[in-house]
Swiss-Prot record:
Region (Required for maintaining the overall integrity of the AHR:ARNT heterodimer and its transcriptional activity): 50-82, 118-126, 266-268
Location (main, coarse): cytoplasm
Name assigned to this protein: Aryl hydrocarbon receptor
Organism encoding this protein: Homo sapiens (Human)
Oligomer and partners: Homodimer. Heterodimer; efficient DNA binding requires dimerization with another bHLH protein. Interacts with ARNT; the heterodimer ARNT:AHR binds to core DNA sequence 5'-TGCGTG-3' within the dioxin response element (DRE) of target gene promoters and activates their transcription. Binds MYBBP1A. Interacts with coactivators including SRC-1, RIP140 and NOCA7, and with the corepressor SMRT. Interacts with NEDD8 and IVNS1ABP. Interacts with BMAL1. Interacts with HSP90AB1. Interacts with TIPARP; leading to mono-ADP-ribosylation of AHR and subsequent inhibition of AHR.
Keyword Metal-binding recorded: no
Induction: Induced or repressed by TGFB1 and dioxin in a cell-type specific fashion. Repressed by cAMP, retinoic acid, and 12-O-tetradecanoyl phorbol-13 acetate (TPA).
Function, as annotated: Ligand-activated transcription factor that enables cells to adapt to changing conditions by sensing compounds from the environment, diet, microbiome and cellular metabolism, and which plays important roles in development, immunity and cancer. Upon ligand binding, translocates into the nucleus, where it heterodimerizes with ARNT and induces transcription by binding to xenobiotic response elements (XRE). Regulates a variety of biological processes, including angiogenesis, hematopoiesis, drug and lipid metabolism, cell motility and immune modulation.
Location of region: Disordered: 1-39, 824-848
Keywords of the record: Acetylation, Activator, ADP-ribosylation, Biological rhythms, Cell cycle, Cytoplasm, Disease variant, DNA-binding, Nucleus, Receptor, Repeat, Repressor, Retinitis pigmentosa, Transcription, Transcription regulation
Cellular localization per UniProt: Cytoplasm; Nucleus
Propeptide intervals in chain numbering: 1-10
């Protein structure tokens, strides 16, 4: 046993693909007589006919050798005999009338569909092993878990699939008493391949327990050979089933008598580690391809044909397998290819494969190198389709470094000449003289002919340009994304060429600069001369027949084209009028229509209005004793309103040229004495800290200046105030100048209408009066009024300003063209009266 255990072998794909049979033409001189050849031809014909009757796909049948055809034929007949007995179907039912045949075929079709669905829902595969360790039956789903096809394991020794350390345990589970050492029959021998006793003991059914006995149930774990993407090469499987009689085999003993049915293990093998949800969803789409060592496809299973759409002949006759890989993924796959050649496994990689309908599908792949006689023989690639979102996520995480080392010769297999045609060159090399496109095409053709057919760039050149320029994907937004990576891969290849030094005669990477026209650019660049050299291609003809222009493709690439709003309509209901009104109020509060004059220039003005000012001051002195209490409280209210509205600093960003309609509600003519006592200048004003910081300004209308007439209904008077020219005099910020500017004459003879009252307050206070209602406020501190004193410099400036009579101010045409007269001009006070009386608000028309 020890000597034979050294020659332990595992299951592998031993059969070779038979040479395709071709019918030779009959020679003209006639058929030569060769009995042995005629016998071989007749035998091959019968074997081909027998193979066509097997219940396997045609691609599996084409790969079977003669011994495999005979082996599978015997196993199929044995399985059919078992089911005939198990299902108790009589020959009369099978050979009945036409109606019975139709009903039987219908039931058979239903049963077949039900069985397929059950196998798909099962997390594992079905395995039937006889007591002599032969695989009686294995379901087709064994390929999804172990990588072996159904035809590879049927009627083969099960020990070729089992790990050497688990074979003894598996043999013990095959015995009904879990004690195979009791088999001391003369037929017992030693199997050379496994080193285990090969028992041929036949039991009488009366000597063993019945089928429904608990002693016949089995549940154990062993490791099976796995060709899929696991590092150890074995997969731990859980076997759960029972020993049952295998009917209908009709085996004969040594004396020629028919032996009774023998026991066999009917079990379901499931992976010990349960699969994830993702594996459950995608396990039915896993397909496998077989390649040569240079990645040339030589086979594909049925699921691969469904996913990719190619037939096996189309895959195997196109040459290098890199023709089916996206250009942006070629270098990435080539790196994994070299890793697999060195280590025997590529690891999990994600890339794009080209389907038959010119679509790119993302797959997760793992390649394994299989050996024969100690030498690499071929490559088995297991691939699982992915969604576009999963593939894009893997692509963003991919390392974009150069995979090859040019100094060690790893890039020798991938020639790096520049064979790109004008339409595919992502970064054309422009020459000084600017050669034409025809010369470039000729150079490209020569470079393409000089390429090694098995090189990476040769495979890229054999791809159709339309799969990158016009990808037939479900969403057009993926086109720029794919072309972007395609151009990046082209640039990487070109960088390889630029950085490569000669290494030898035949093993160097050749670099040839191809002259390209300057109007040729990449697809994503949107150059005006794009695709000029492709107008004679078949692709251009197809697009012309479909009515598609290259300009349409440019619009499809532009993502902004899909996001533009071409309605051009503005819904005024979407405009927030509240913000506009508040903005206008704030602007009106922060702008002054009157600009003061300079204090230095006021003293140099001529004294032409002394009579008017003296009369004004005389009237103020007469009324100061009667209106002292009336003035103090409104003045405090005015300061409180200014503090509440926070008008400090609101007059900085104003524009005197802005047109602002000013609404002035007409009030009943009232006379208020603003300042009755000007001797108390030394007394501290309670709101001086707030008033001094405010750049309050005000100018006055000249004595002979015409004003606007009174409104007919005495409601509101709207007139523009934005065209006043700014005064050349700087603003005053002191409290004295502020107090001085508020004094206006009340009884003046200007020849104007006495019924009209002109209102000249600041714009900010007009807004304050209209937007806030005057409520009685507590009186904090009474301010001693200042009586006019001509000796004071501030008052003297005020007197000189009005005695001159010429203020050099320009007013709108609406004010200059009115010839009304007024005997007395009443000043609308800038503060509120003592009684609680709400002021009328400005109407919305004044703002809108």
């Amino acid at each position: 046993m020890n000597s034979s255990s050294a020659n332990i072998t595992y299951a592998s794909r031993k059969r070779r693909k038979p040479v395709q049979k071709t019918v030779k033409p009959i020679p003209a001189e006639g058929i030569k007589s060769n009995p042995s050849k005629r016998h071989r031809d007749r035998l091959n014909t019968e074997l081909d006919r027998l193979a066509s009757l097997l219940p396997f796909p045609q691609d599996v049948i084409n790969k079977l050798d003669k011994l495999s055809v005979l082996r599978l034929s015997v196993s199929y007949l044995r399985a059919k005999s078992f089911f005939d007995v198990a299902l108790k179907s009589s020959p009369t039912e099978r050979n009945g009338g036409q109606d019975n045949c139709r009903a039987a075929n219908f039931r058979e079709g239903l049963n077949l569909q039900e069985g397929e669905f059950l196998l798909q829902a099962l997390n594992g595969f079905v395995l039937v092993v006889t007591t002599d360790a032969l695989v009686f039956y294995a379901s087709s789903t064994i390929q999804d878990y172990l990588g072996f096809q159904q035809s590879d394991v049927i009627h083969q020794s099960v020990y070729e699939l089992i790990h050497t350390e688990d074979r003894a345990e598996f043999q013990r589970q095959l015995h009904w008493a879990l004690n195979p050492s009791q088999c001391t029959e003369s037929g017992q021998g030693i199997e050379e391949a496994t080193g285990l006793p090969q028992t041929v003991v036949c039991y009488n059914p009366d000597q063993i327990p019945p089928e429904n006995s608990p002693l016949m149930e089995r549940c154990f774990i062993c490791r099976l050979r796995c060709l899929l993407d696991n590092s150890s090469g074995f997969l731990a499987m859980n076997f759960q089933g029972k020993l049952k009689y295998l009917h209908g085999q009709k085996k004969k003993g040594k004396d020629g008598s028919i032996l009774p049915p023998q026991l066999a293990l009917f079990a379901i093998a499931t992976p010990l580690q349960p699969p994830s949800i993702l594996e459950i969803r995608t396990k039915n789409f896993i397909f496998r391809t077989k390649h040569k060592l240079d990645f040339t496809p030589i086979g594909c299973d049925a699921k691969g044909r469904i996913v990719l759409g190619y037939t096996e002949a189309e895959l195997c006759t196109r040459g290098s397998g890199y023709q089916f890989i996206h250009a942006a993924d070629m270098l990435y796959c080539a790196e994994s290819h070299i890793r697999m050649i060195k280590t025997g496994e590529s690891g999990m990689i994600v890339f794009r494969l080209l389907t038959k309908n010119n679509r790119w599908t993302w797959v997760q792949s793992n390649a394994r190198l299989l050996y024969k006689n100690g030498r690499p023989d071929y490559i088995i690639v297991t691939q699982r389709p992915l969604t576009d979102e999963e593939g894009t996520e893997h692509l963003r995480k991919r390392n974009t470094k150069l995979p090859f080392m040019f100094t060690t010769g790893e890039a020798v297999l991938y020639e790096a000449t520049n064979p790109f045609p004008a339409i595919m060159d992502p970064l054309p090399l422009r020459t000084k003289n600017g050669t034409s496109g025809k010369d470039s095409a000729t150079t490209s053709t020569l470079s393409k002919d000089s390429l090694n057919p098995s090189s990476l760039l040769a495979a890229m050149m054999q791809q159709d340009e339309s799969i990158y320029l016009y990808p037939a994907s479900s969403t057009s937004s993926t086109a720029p994304f794919e072309n972007n990576f395609f151009n990046e891969s082209m640039n990487e290849c070109r960088n390889w060429q630029d950085n490569t030094a000669p290494m030898g005669n035949d093993t160097i990477l050749k670099h040839e600069q191809i002259d390209q026209p300057q109007d040729v650019n990449s697809f994503a660049g949107g150059h005006p001369g794009l695709f000029q050299d492709s107008k004679n291609s078949d692709l251009y003809s197809i697009m012309k027949n479909l009515g598609i222009d290259f300009e349409d493709i440019r619009h499809m690439q532009n993502e902004k084209f899909f996001r533009n709003d071409f309605s051009g309509e503005v819904d005024f209901r979407d405009i927030d009028l509240t913000d506009e009104i508040l903005t206008y109020v704030q602007d009106s509060l922060s702008k002054s229509p009157f600009i003061p004059s300079d204090y230095q220039q006021q003293q140099s003005l001529a004294l032409n209005s002394s009579c008017m000012v003296q009369e004004h001051l005389h009237l103020e002195q007469q009324q100061q004793h009667h209106q002292k209490q009336v003035v103090v409280e409104p003045q405090q209210q005015l300061c409180q309103k200014m503090k509440h509205m926070q008008v400090n600093g609101m007059f900085e960003n104003w524009n005197s040229n802005q047109f602002v309609p000013f609404n002035c509600p007409q009030q009943d003519p009232q006379q208020y004495n603003v300042f009755t006592d000007l001797h108390g200048i030394s007394q501290e004003f309670p709101y001086k800290s707030e008033m001094d910081s405010m750049p309050y300004t005000q100018n006055f209308i000249s004595c002979n200046q015409p004003v606007l007439p009174q409104h007919s209904k005495c409601t509101e008077l709207d007139y523009p105030m934005g065209s006043f020219e700014p005064s050349p005099y700087p603003t005053t910020s002191s409290l004295e100048d502020f107090v001085t500017c508020l004094q206006l004459p009340e009884n003046q003879k200007h020849g104007l209408n006495p019924q009209s009252a002109i209102i000249t307050p600041q714009t900010c206070y007009a807004g304050a009066v209209s937007m806030y209602q005057c409520q009685p406020e507590p009186q904090h501190t009474h301010v001693g009024q200042m009586q006019y004193n001509p000796v004071l410099p501030g008052q003297q400036a005020f007197l000189n300003k009005f005695q001159n009579g010429v203020l050099n101010e320009t007013y709108p045409a609406e004010l200059n063209n009115i010839n009304n007269t007024q005997t007395t001009t009443h000043l609308q006070p800038l503060h509120h009266p003592s009684e609680a009386r709400p002021f009328p608000d400005l109407t919305s028309s004044g703002f809108l």
